[in-house]
Amino acid sequence: MNIGGGKFLLGRISNNPTSGIVGLANVGKSTFFQAITNSKLGNPANYPFATIDAECAKVNIPSVPLSNLLRIYQSAKCVPGTLTIYDIAGLTRGASQGHGLGNKFLNDIRHVEGIFQVVRGFLKEDITHIEGNVDPVRDLSVVQDELILKDLEFLENIRERLSKKMRMVSKNSKEHQEMKIETELLDALEEHLFNGKKIRHFKDHWNLDEVKILNKHNFLTSKPTLILLNVSPQDYVRNENKFVRNIIEWINEFSPGDKFLLFSAEFESQLMECKGIASEYFDKIKEDTNVSDQQLVSAIPQIILEMRKLLNLISFFTCGPQEVHQWNIREGTTAQEAAGVIHSDLRETFISADVIKYDDLKKMEPPLNESLLKSKGLIKRAGKQYIMQDNDIALFKAAGGKIKK
């Protein structure tokens, strides 16, 4: 997708975005899954491969504009945008060769659009570590190496198929030239992978031909990644951990562009279980760390919003007396394409859209006075090629007098 300035976005991101939770066994993936989805799905247990089949659940994307627009429009209900989360089986060394649940693990990753990579940063003797000791940098390297090895295998298979096809068509044909360009890109990516680097970080800006090639093949290391260091509740509320510096150094060298956050699966689990911080458990944390109630907050909203940003997602809203609806779209989406997210017919019959900027509305008091907005020139007519902006409010108009609110 072209987001302007000749920049094209890498990745096959849908309007119903998905992310998978990955990492070694026993690092807190399933506990994190339960916390982020506010459910009892998943199987957090103190042994490897407690999760076999990937669980999934939808989570709401936090949105201040959504609740504010509900108030301004006095709508009967609101429908938030969502992100589908998968709890994927734990990885082990040799996964790319099929060891453990390797083939299933890697196949599950191929079907998601973003990756939450959980690494263990807490010390607890009663919770075993599959590698024998806690070392998040080693764990990051193990997972990345397995993804790279699988991509190298996949890349070689693609190149062999291309080589056979190229011998069957004229060297002067357009098809041959396209396959030659693809082969040259794959050769460059292979060298990059051999250096222990992800495809996603091969370059900062991709051209349209490169994006088409990479999105077609859906390489594992082309997916955006949010690294989550699972620490003790005490480290989390103090926002410190002895492994942080080494992790940041590793990211800068081997995975630049990946984002990194601290969280505590135990803290989030207790927060969900106790339905707040009014409990002896959190009183003990405050006593141990000398922090205030204001510091005992969940990391989940920030984690979801960070993944939203990594997936290059924005939102637009349709508003009316029945509902305020938040819709996921990707940066660079046109007004006509956004209409198609609501219904494919609306894209085909699109005429125009009336667009209001959220910033022009957010301080207004209900009930909304659309006549006042029009008199101030705050309702803009947008054509097919208008590029939607984050938090736009849109009323789409279609042929045949059909209007979708």
From Swiss-Prot:
SUPFAM superfamilies: P-loop containing nucleoside triphosphate hydrolases, TGS-like. Residues 312-398 form the TGS domain. One of its GO terms (molecular function) is GTP binding. One of its GO terms (cellular component) is mitochondrion. It is found in: Mitochondrion. Residues 17-283 form the OBG-type G domain. Gene3D superfamilies: 3.10.20.30, P-loop containing nucleotide triphosphate hydrolases, TGS-like domain. ATP binds at N26, V27, G28, K29, S30, T31, V231. Signal peptide: none annotated. Keywords: ATP-binding, GTP-binding, Mitochondrion, Nucleotide-binding. Coiled coil: none annotated. InterPro entries: ATPase_YchF/OLA1 (IPR004396), Beta-grasp_dom_sf (IPR012675), G_OBG (IPR031167), GTP-bd (IPR006073), P-loop_NTPase (IPR027417), TGS (IPR004095), TGS-like (IPR012676), TGS-like_dom_sf (IPR023192). Present with 2360 molecules/cell in log phase SD medium. NCBIfam families: redox-regulated ATPase YchF. Belongs to the TRAFAC class OBG-HflX-like GTPase superfamily. OBG GTPase family. Hydrolyzes ATP, and can also hydrolyze GTP with lower efficiency. Has lower affinity for GTP. This is Obg-like ATPase homolog.
